Protein backbone atom coordinates (compact mmCIF):
# COMPACT_ATOMS: atom_id res chain seq x y z
CA UNK A 1 0.00 0.00 0.00
CA UNK A 2 1.14 3.52 -0.81
CA UNK A 3 2.57 5.23 2.28
CA UNK A 4 1.15 8.75 2.44
CA UNK A 5 2.21 11.18 5.16
CA UNK A 6 1.61 14.82 6.07
CA UNK A 7 3.98 17.39 7.52
CA UNK A 8 2.45 20.52 9.06
CA UNK A 9 4.80 23.45 9.59
CA UNK A 10 4.74 26.61 11.67
CA UNK A 11 5.36 27.65 15.25
CA UNK A 12 1.71 28.63 15.68
CA UNK A 13 0.61 25.09 14.77
CA UNK A 14 3.31 23.38 16.82
CA UNK A 15 2.55 25.42 19.94
CA UNK A 16 -1.23 25.01 19.68
CA UNK A 17 -1.94 28.68 18.97
CA UNK A 18 -4.11 27.64 16.03
CA UNK A 19 -5.94 24.36 15.42
CA UNK A 20 -4.54 22.34 12.52
CA UNK A 21 -7.79 22.03 10.58
CA UNK A 22 -5.87 21.37 7.36
CA UNK A 23 -4.49 18.12 8.77
CA UNK A 24 -7.92 16.90 9.84
CA UNK A 25 -9.41 17.80 6.48
CA UNK A 26 -6.64 16.13 4.47
CA UNK A 27 -6.77 12.95 6.55
CA UNK A 28 -10.52 12.65 5.96
CA UNK A 29 -10.36 13.62 2.28
CA UNK A 30 -7.52 11.25 1.43
CA UNK A 31 -9.13 8.42 3.40
CA UNK A 32 -12.19 8.63 1.16
CA UNK A 33 -9.93 8.55 -1.91
CA UNK A 34 -8.41 5.27 -0.74
CA UNK A 35 -5.26 7.03 0.53
CA UNK A 36 -5.30 6.78 4.34
CA UNK A 37 -2.48 8.72 6.00
CA UNK A 38 0.07 6.52 7.74
CA UNK A 39 1.73 9.32 9.72
CA UNK A 40 1.39 13.03 10.56
CA UNK A 41 4.18 15.24 11.88
CA UNK A 42 4.42 18.88 12.94
CA UNK A 43 7.59 21.01 12.90
CA UNK A 44 8.09 24.66 13.81
CA UNK A 45 9.71 27.45 11.81
CA UNK A 46 13.27 26.18 12.14
CA UNK A 47 15.30 25.51 8.99
CA UNK A 48 17.48 22.75 10.46
CA UNK A 49 14.45 20.92 11.87
CA UNK A 50 12.62 21.18 8.56
CA UNK A 51 15.57 19.88 6.55
CA UNK A 52 16.10 17.02 9.00
CA UNK A 53 12.51 15.78 8.88
CA UNK A 54 12.28 16.12 5.08
CA UNK A 55 15.36 13.93 4.68
CA UNK A 56 14.11 11.48 7.30
CA UNK A 57 10.62 11.04 5.83
CA UNK A 58 12.06 10.78 2.31
CA UNK A 59 13.45 7.38 3.34
CA UNK A 60 10.09 6.04 4.53
CA UNK A 61 7.13 7.71 2.78
CA UNK A 62 6.03 7.37 -0.84
CA UNK A 63 4.13 10.67 -0.73
CA UNK A 64 4.53 13.57 1.71
CA UNK A 65 2.16 16.54 1.78
CA UNK A 66 3.94 19.52 3.35
CA UNK A 67 1.64 22.30 4.49
CA UNK A 68 2.60 25.89 5.33
CA UNK A 69 5.70 28.02 5.10
CA UNK A 70 5.21 29.39 1.55
CA UNK A 71 4.42 32.98 2.48
CA UNK A 72 6.52 36.13 1.94
CA UNK A 73 7.88 36.57 5.47
CA UNK A 74 11.18 35.57 7.06
CA UNK A 75 9.67 32.64 8.95
CA UNK A 76 8.34 31.03 5.75
CA UNK A 77 11.06 28.47 5.14
CA UNK A 78 9.55 25.54 3.25
CA UNK A 79 11.01 26.30 -0.19
CA UNK A 80 14.49 26.88 1.25
CA UNK A 81 14.21 23.73 3.36
CA UNK A 82 13.26 21.64 0.32
CA UNK A 83 16.15 23.04 -1.71
CA UNK A 84 18.60 22.50 1.15
CA UNK A 85 17.40 18.93 1.71
CA UNK A 86 18.04 18.22 -1.98
CA UNK A 87 21.37 20.02 -2.05
CA UNK A 88 20.32 22.57 -4.65
CA UNK A 89 19.53 26.25 -4.83
CA UNK A 90 16.42 28.34 -5.35
CA UNK A 91 15.54 29.74 -8.77
CA UNK A 92 13.05 32.44 -9.70
CA UNK A 93 9.91 31.20 -11.44
CA UNK A 94 9.37 34.14 -13.78
CA UNK A 95 5.89 33.11 -14.91
CA UNK A 96 4.61 32.97 -11.32
CA UNK A 97 6.22 36.32 -10.52
CA UNK A 98 4.27 37.87 -13.39
CA UNK A 99 1.11 36.12 -12.21
CA UNK A 100 1.53 37.61 -8.73
CA UNK A 101 2.11 41.07 -10.17
CA UNK A 102 -1.09 40.70 -12.21
CA UNK A 103 -2.94 39.47 -9.10
CA UNK A 104 -2.06 42.62 -7.14
CA UNK A 105 -2.59 44.97 -10.10
CA UNK A 106 -6.14 43.70 -10.66
CA UNK A 107 -6.88 44.56 -7.04
CA UNK A 108 -5.46 48.05 -7.30
CA UNK A 109 -2.42 47.25 -5.15
CA UNK A 110 1.32 47.32 -5.63
CA UNK A 111 3.09 44.05 -4.91
CA UNK A 112 5.54 44.33 -2.01
CA UNK A 113 9.15 43.34 -2.74
CA UNK A 114 8.87 40.60 -0.11
CA UNK A 115 6.31 38.74 -2.26
CA UNK A 116 9.06 37.99 -4.79
CA UNK A 117 10.17 35.27 -2.38
CA UNK A 118 6.99 33.32 -3.18
CA UNK A 119 8.21 32.78 -6.75
CA UNK A 120 11.56 31.28 -5.66
CA UNK A 121 11.41 27.50 -5.94
CA UNK A 122 13.95 24.66 -5.67
CA UNK A 123 15.80 24.24 -8.96
CA UNK A 124 14.34 20.79 -9.69
CA UNK A 125 10.81 21.58 -8.49
CA UNK A 126 7.66 20.96 -10.49
CA UNK A 127 5.45 24.05 -10.33
CA UNK A 128 1.93 23.58 -8.90
CA UNK A 129 -0.58 26.30 -9.62
CA UNK A 130 -2.53 28.12 -6.92
CA UNK A 131 -5.63 29.55 -8.65
CA UNK A 132 -6.89 31.37 -5.54
CA UNK A 133 -3.82 32.95 -3.91
CA UNK A 134 -0.26 34.22 -4.26
CA UNK A 135 1.60 31.22 -2.80
CA UNK A 136 2.21 28.69 -5.56
CA UNK A 137 2.92 25.11 -4.64
CA UNK A 138 5.60 22.80 -5.95
CA UNK A 139 6.65 19.16 -5.94
CA UNK A 140 10.09 17.60 -5.58
CA UNK A 141 11.36 14.04 -5.60
CA UNK A 142 13.66 13.31 -2.66
CA UNK A 143 14.94 9.74 -2.45
CA UNK A 144 11.86 7.46 -2.61
CA UNK A 145 9.39 10.21 -1.68
CA UNK A 146 7.34 12.53 -3.87
CA UNK A 147 6.83 15.69 -1.81
CA UNK A 148 4.14 18.27 -2.41
CA UNK A 149 4.50 21.71 -0.80
CA UNK A 150 1.28 23.63 -0.19
CA UNK A 151 0.20 26.96 1.39
CA UNK A 152 -1.32 27.02 4.86
CA UNK A 153 -4.41 29.08 3.98
CA UNK A 154 -7.22 26.47 4.19
CA UNK A 155 -9.19 27.66 1.16
CA UNK A 156 -6.05 27.61 -1.01
CA UNK A 157 -4.81 24.31 0.41
CA UNK A 158 -8.08 22.48 -0.28
CA UNK A 159 -8.36 23.72 -3.87
CA UNK A 160 -4.79 22.69 -4.63
CA UNK A 161 -5.16 19.24 -3.07
CA UNK A 162 -8.39 18.50 -4.92
CA UNK A 163 -7.55 19.99 -8.32
CA UNK A 164 -3.75 19.84 -8.58
CA UNK A 165 -2.29 17.20 -6.26
CA UNK A 166 -4.86 14.40 -6.38
CA UNK A 167 -4.86 14.29 -10.22
CA UNK A 168 -1.04 14.04 -10.16
CA UNK A 169 -1.21 11.16 -7.70
CA UNK A 170 -3.70 9.36 -9.92
CA UNK A 171 -1.40 9.81 -12.90
CA UNK A 172 1.74 8.55 -11.14
CA UNK A 173 0.40 5.78 -8.94
CA UNK A 174 -2.11 2.96 -9.16
CA UNK A 175 -4.47 4.03 -6.41
CA UNK A 176 -6.68 1.56 -4.54
CA UNK A 177 -10.45 1.67 -4.81
CA UNK A 178 -11.88 4.05 -2.19
CA UNK A 179 -13.48 2.37 0.82
CA UNK A 180 -17.20 2.43 1.47
CA UNK A 181 -18.24 4.40 4.54
CA UNK A 182 -21.84 4.33 5.80
CA UNK A 183 -22.77 6.74 8.58
CA UNK A 184 -25.66 6.94 11.03
CA UNK A 185 -25.92 9.69 13.64
CA UNK A 186 -27.67 9.08 16.95
CA UNK A 187 -28.90 11.27 19.78
CA UNK A 188 -29.99 10.32 23.26
CA UNK A 189 -28.11 7.09 23.96
CA UNK A 190 -24.62 6.73 25.42
CA UNK A 191 -21.71 5.27 23.47
CA UNK A 192 -21.43 2.30 25.85
CA UNK A 193 -25.16 1.59 25.61
CA UNK A 194 -25.04 1.60 21.81
CA UNK A 195 -21.91 -0.56 21.74
CA UNK A 196 -23.47 -3.14 24.04
CA UNK A 197 -26.50 -3.39 21.75
CA UNK A 198 -24.51 -3.48 18.51
CA UNK A 199 -21.63 -5.76 19.49
CA UNK A 200 -23.74 -8.84 18.75
CA UNK A 201 -24.00 -7.96 15.03
CA UNK A 202 -21.76 -9.97 12.71
CA UNK A 203 -19.52 -7.79 10.52
CA UNK A 204 -18.62 -8.79 6.95
CA UNK A 205 -14.93 -9.51 6.19
CA UNK A 206 -12.77 -6.39 6.35
CA UNK A 207 -15.60 -4.22 7.73
CA UNK A 208 -15.20 -2.25 10.95
CA UNK A 209 -17.75 -0.52 13.18
CA UNK A 210 -16.60 2.82 14.54
CA UNK A 211 -18.05 5.18 17.14
CA UNK A 212 -17.36 8.93 17.17
CA UNK A 213 -18.76 10.83 20.12
CA UNK A 214 -19.18 14.57 19.65
CA UNK A 215 -21.56 15.79 22.32
CA UNK A 216 -24.54 15.73 22.00
CA UNK A 217 -24.43 13.18 19.15
CA UNK A 218 -22.71 9.87 18.45
CA UNK A 219 -21.83 8.86 14.90
CA UNK A 220 -21.89 5.17 13.99
CA UNK A 221 -19.65 4.40 11.04
CA UNK A 222 -19.35 1.22 8.99
CA UNK A 223 -16.16 1.22 6.92
CA UNK A 224 -15.03 -1.51 4.55
CA UNK A 225 -13.93 -2.48 1.04
CA UNK A 226 -16.14 -1.67 -1.94
CA UNK A 227 -16.50 -5.40 -2.59
CA UNK A 228 -18.56 -5.65 0.61
CA UNK A 229 -20.89 -2.72 -0.11
CA UNK A 230 -24.01 -4.84 -0.55
CA UNK A 231 -23.39 -6.70 2.70
CA UNK A 232 -22.63 -3.40 4.46
CA UNK A 233 -25.88 -1.82 3.30
CA UNK A 234 -27.78 -4.83 4.64
CA UNK A 235 -25.87 -4.59 7.92
CA UNK A 236 -26.66 -0.86 8.12
CA UNK A 237 -30.37 -1.73 8.20
CA UNK A 238 -29.70 -3.97 11.20
CA UNK A 239 -27.75 -1.18 12.90
CA UNK A 240 -30.68 1.21 12.38
CA UNK A 241 -33.07 -1.35 13.80
CA UNK A 242 -30.95 -1.94 16.91
CA UNK A 243 -30.20 1.77 17.47
CA UNK A 244 -33.93 2.43 17.18
CA UNK A 245 -35.34 5.90 17.81
CA UNK A 246 -31.92 7.30 18.64
CA UNK A 247 -31.03 7.48 14.92
CA UNK A 248 -31.68 11.04 13.78
CA UNK A 249 -30.09 11.11 10.32
CA UNK A 250 -27.96 9.21 7.82
CA UNK A 251 -24.92 10.39 5.89
CA UNK A 252 -22.95 13.58 6.49
CA UNK A 253 -25.46 16.29 5.60
CA UNK A 254 -26.47 17.05 9.18
CA UNK A 255 -29.84 17.43 10.87
CA UNK A 256 -30.30 21.20 10.29
CA UNK A 257 -29.73 20.75 6.55
CA UNK A 258 -32.16 17.84 6.33
CA UNK A 259 -34.81 19.77 8.28
CA UNK A 260 -34.26 22.81 6.07
CA UNK A 261 -34.79 20.77 2.92
CA UNK A 262 -37.95 19.16 4.32
CA UNK A 263 -39.38 22.56 5.34
CA UNK A 264 -38.74 23.92 1.86
CA UNK A 265 -40.19 20.85 0.14
CA UNK A 266 -43.38 21.16 2.21
CA UNK A 267 -43.45 24.97 1.95
CA UNK A 268 -43.39 25.51 5.71
CA UNK A 269 -41.98 28.71 7.16
CA UNK A 270 -40.65 28.58 10.72
CA UNK A 271 -40.52 31.06 13.57
CA UNK A 272 -38.34 30.53 16.65
CA UNK A 273 -38.43 31.71 20.25
CA UNK A 274 -35.38 30.78 22.33
CA UNK A 275 -34.42 31.32 25.95
CA UNK A 276 -32.02 28.68 27.27
CA UNK A 277 -30.53 27.82 23.85
CA UNK A 278 -29.59 31.46 23.30
CA UNK A 279 -29.96 31.53 19.51
CA UNK A 280 -28.32 28.18 18.72
CA UNK A 281 -31.39 26.98 16.85
CA UNK A 282 -31.52 30.12 14.73
CA UNK A 283 -27.79 29.90 14.01
CA UNK A 284 -27.85 26.25 12.94
CA UNK A 285 -30.99 26.52 10.85
CA UNK A 286 -30.04 29.80 9.18
CA UNK A 287 -26.66 28.36 8.17
CA UNK A 288 -28.55 25.47 6.59
CA UNK A 289 -30.77 27.85 4.62
CA UNK A 290 -33.99 27.07 6.48
CA UNK A 291 -37.03 29.27 5.67
CA UNK A 292 -37.00 31.22 8.93
CA UNK A 293 -39.73 33.84 9.21
CA UNK A 294 -38.82 35.37 12.58
CA UNK A 295 -36.39 34.53 15.38
CA UNK A 296 -36.12 35.90 18.89
CA UNK A 297 -33.86 35.30 21.89
CA UNK A 298 -35.39 36.47 25.16
CA UNK A 299 -34.14 36.41 28.76
CA UNK A 300 -34.87 33.26 30.73
CA UNK A 301 -37.99 33.36 32.85
CA UNK A 302 -39.81 30.71 34.82
CA UNK A 303 -42.99 29.57 33.12
CA UNK A 304 -45.32 26.60 33.14
CA UNK A 305 -45.63 24.19 30.24
CA UNK A 306 -49.05 25.63 29.45
CA UNK A 307 -47.62 29.16 29.28
CA UNK A 308 -44.91 28.07 26.84
CA UNK A 309 -47.44 26.21 24.69
CA UNK A 310 -49.90 29.12 24.55
CA UNK A 311 -47.12 31.62 23.85
CA UNK A 312 -45.73 29.75 20.84
CA UNK A 313 -49.25 29.14 19.52
CA UNK A 314 -49.89 32.89 19.57
CA UNK A 315 -46.49 33.58 18.00
CA UNK A 316 -47.23 31.24 15.09
CA UNK A 317 -50.56 32.99 14.48
CA UNK A 318 -49.13 36.50 14.80
CA UNK A 319 -46.35 35.79 12.29
CA UNK A 320 -48.56 33.78 9.90
CA UNK A 321 -45.95 31.05 10.13
CA UNK A 322 -46.33 27.44 9.11
CA UNK A 323 -44.55 26.24 12.25
CA UNK A 324 -43.28 27.80 15.47
CA UNK A 325 -40.77 26.29 17.89
CA UNK A 326 -39.97 27.43 21.43
CA UNK A 327 -37.36 26.56 24.06
CA UNK A 328 -38.04 28.03 27.50
CA UNK A 329 -35.60 29.08 30.20
CA UNK A 330 -33.78 26.53 32.36
CA UNK A 331 -35.12 26.73 35.90
CA UNK A 332 -34.53 24.18 38.69
CA UNK A 333 -33.22 21.62 36.17
CA UNK A 334 -36.46 21.88 34.15
CA UNK A 335 -37.26 23.45 30.80
CA UNK A 336 -40.05 23.38 28.24
CA UNK A 337 -40.19 22.70 24.51
CA UNK A 338 -43.21 23.54 22.38
CA UNK A 339 -43.94 23.12 18.68
CA UNK A 340 -46.95 24.87 17.13
CA UNK A 341 -48.17 23.27 13.89
CA UNK A 342 -51.26 23.27 11.66
CA UNK A 343 -52.30 20.11 13.55
CA UNK A 344 -52.07 21.72 16.98
CA UNK A 345 -49.39 22.59 19.52
CA UNK A 346 -47.30 19.88 21.14
CA UNK A 347 -45.29 20.61 24.29
CA UNK A 348 -42.90 18.75 26.58
CA UNK A 349 -41.51 19.59 30.01
CA UNK A 350 -38.20 17.83 30.69
CA UNK A 351 -35.76 17.39 33.53
CA UNK A 352 -32.03 17.47 32.86
CA UNK A 353 -30.98 14.58 35.10
CA UNK A 354 -27.25 15.38 35.13
CA UNK A 355 -25.48 18.65 35.83
CA UNK A 356 -21.88 17.57 35.24
CA UNK A 357 -21.92 19.07 31.76
CA UNK A 358 -21.00 22.67 31.06
CA UNK A 359 -23.58 25.29 30.17
CA UNK A 360 -22.45 25.23 26.53
CA UNK A 361 -22.95 21.47 26.23
CA UNK A 362 -26.35 21.59 27.91
CA UNK A 363 -27.39 24.28 25.45
CA UNK A 364 -26.17 22.12 22.55
CA UNK A 365 -28.11 19.13 23.90
CA UNK A 366 -31.32 21.14 24.25
CA UNK A 367 -30.95 22.65 20.78
CA UNK A 368 -30.56 19.14 19.36
CA UNK A 369 -33.62 17.96 21.29
CA UNK A 370 -35.66 20.82 19.83
CA UNK A 371 -34.45 19.99 16.31
CA UNK A 372 -35.27 16.34 16.90
CA UNK A 373 -38.81 17.26 17.99
CA UNK A 374 -39.23 19.17 14.74
CA UNK A 375 -37.74 16.30 12.71
CA UNK A 376 -40.05 13.76 14.31
CA UNK A 377 -43.17 15.86 13.66
CA UNK A 378 -42.14 16.34 10.02
CA UNK A 379 -41.74 12.55 9.75
CA UNK A 380 -45.18 11.91 11.25
CA UNK A 381 -43.82 10.54 14.54
CA UNK A 382 -44.63 11.27 18.16
CA UNK A 383 -42.48 14.27 19.14
CA UNK A 384 -41.29 12.63 22.38
CA UNK A 385 -38.50 10.04 22.29
CA UNK A 386 -35.82 8.59 24.57
CA UNK A 387 -33.03 11.05 25.36
CA UNK A 388 -30.76 9.34 27.86
CA UNK A 389 -30.20 11.76 30.71
CA UNK A 390 -33.14 13.99 29.68
CA UNK A 391 -36.40 12.79 31.26
CA UNK A 392 -39.79 13.87 29.91
CA UNK A 393 -41.95 14.56 32.97
CA UNK A 394 -45.00 16.26 31.41
CA UNK A 395 -46.56 16.64 27.99
CA UNK A 396 -49.58 18.44 26.62
CA UNK A 397 -51.37 19.10 23.36
CA UNK A 398 -53.39 22.16 22.36
CA UNK A 399 -55.94 21.49 19.64
CA UNK A 400 -56.23 23.82 16.66
Mark where each language-model region is.
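Conserved hydrophobic helix-helix packing surfaces used for dimerization/oligomerization
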Residues: 4-6, 147, 270
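Glycine-rich phosphate/diphosphate-binding loop of Rossmann-like nucleotide-binding domains
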Residues: 1-41, 292-294
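N-terminal beta-loop-helix "entrance" segment that forms/cooperates
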Residues: 27, 31-59, 305-307
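Short alpha-helical segments enriched in small residues
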Residues: 230-400
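Proline/glycine-rich low-complexity loops and linkers
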Residues: 42, 48-55, 59, 76-172, ...
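Short beta-strand elements
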Residues: 138-140, 211-213, 335-343
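Accessory alpha-helical/coil subdomains and C-terminal extensions
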Residues: 141-143, 149-216, 223-226, 230-232
